[in-house]
Amino acid sequence: MEKLNLGLAHIGLTVRDMEVSKRFYQDVLEFDLTYEYTLKKDTGDILLAFLSSGNCAIELVQPPDSQPRESGPVDHLALCVKDIDRVRAVLESRGVPFETGDIHYRPDLFPNGSRWVFFRGPDGERLEINELL
């Protein structure tokens, strides 16, 4: 049987303030805004913004009442980087606080090991920068 060969299209994140979140993802994480849309509903407008960086795409969703949806949790969004030390330094220079002081390292995670560290976005979403070794 032929495999479906699925890839990740995007990750949707519920946000309280679309403008604050767009600025964070564009200015701090250097995502490009690729598309915006307002979904008209009887209960109020839902604001959507799609942003991308390399082959990573996210969808920011602001519900009409700016409250988190009941659609279930997303634990974190991991962003792939080639030089975690450099990216971390850039993010720190932009005021991003990290959850831990040290970059985590596991030599047995993935074929050649992995390094990662977590931080939070403007709506408390947990973000990770991750370098596969």
Task: Describe the function of each predicted region.
Residues L60-P63, Q67-V81:
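Helix-adjacent hinge/juxtasegments
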Residues T14-C56:
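Core segments of cupin and vicinal oxygen chelate
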Residues D27-V28, V90-R94:
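Short amphipathic alpha-helices in soluble, non-transmembrane regions
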Residues Y37-K41, P64-D65, I103-L109:
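Short, solvent-exposed loop/turn elements at beta->coil junctions and helix N-caps
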Residues M1-L4, R94-L133:
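Vicinal oxygen chelate
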Residues R23-F24, V90, D123:
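Structural preference for long, well-ordered alpha-helical segments within the folded cores
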